[in-house]
Amino acid sequence: MATRQSVDHFLEQCEGALHFAEFEFNEASRQEHYDDEQFQNSQKYIEEALTDMERLYASSNDQQREMLSRMKQQLNQLRNEMILLRH
């Protein structure tokens, strides 16, 4: 069973990855190929967060799963937007 603290800590990490990726997405939208490495790193952080989430999800209770599902939806949405961006 996942502890509340471990889920909260993980969600904070996801928020960090989400904010970093949003920043890079906005920069890439304006500057195209200025900093491809940072853009790719932000995509990698999203992928890692989604992978780690699957492991944590399996040992979470219903309330924790709901919080993780919401974060997963946000991460997936941004990941898809980044993929579709003509960068």
Give the label of every model feature segment.
Residues 17-24, 45-52, 74:
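Amphipathic, well-ordered alpha-helical segments in soluble domains
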Residues 48-62, 77-87:
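Amphipathic alpha-helical coiled-coil segments
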Residues 27-30, 34, 55, 62, ...:
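Heptad-repeat coiled-coil alpha-helices
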Residues 1-3, 21, 36-37, 71-85:
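Aromatic-enriched hydrophobic runs in primary sequence
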Residues 4, 61-65:
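Short, structured coil/loop segments at alpha-helix boundaries
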